[in-house]
């Protein structure tokens, strides 16, 4: 893994994502970390008064931009001091909205991984508010860092799987080569509240071993009707450091409604979620 992109908004949420990335970089072959700040001022903000009936002038907007540039430069220098000389830290400001800014940097810089923080209960950050849209629209892998998450070396990871999408387990092939830090024991968790797996365990196990033969892995089952609760309960009881979400409409992540994903991310206060692409 050569390059990590982290969108920032100077909140506690993004600060924790940066700290996690810093600690992660000690276990990974990271060469560059890019900090991205969106400074988008809509036409309406430029022509309409604020709630205090103040009209923003071009000078006001430029002053705010300079302040943000100063904050971002300081944040970049602080990160560089923590990472040392082996990792290049780059800062960039975009005049585009967050989603478009992220997409443009991905197109220009080709990062291997996008790291974003999810908000703690009671906190609302600009990045955290858009985390679902960011995760779904990103063309590169996304690592979501809960507000209370502290980096631990990834030794065990759970991969929730609906066997309608069993072929997507093949995306795990080679992941341990492209991400030097990611070579855990895999727990493939078949989320099956309707108990369709009963009597077909051997068939499913053979399919898993064929598709995920580059990892030490084992197949487990969850019959909890609350899919998210079943996954998090399993992870909490098995010393897991990471949840890996497969892409596609049968993924546990993408198959949830917007509100369900929000609830899941809020409930999951500890474990990072890696969303494959």
Region locations from a protein language model:
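Charged helix-capping and loop-helix junction motifs
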Residues: 128-130, 173, 202-205, 257-262
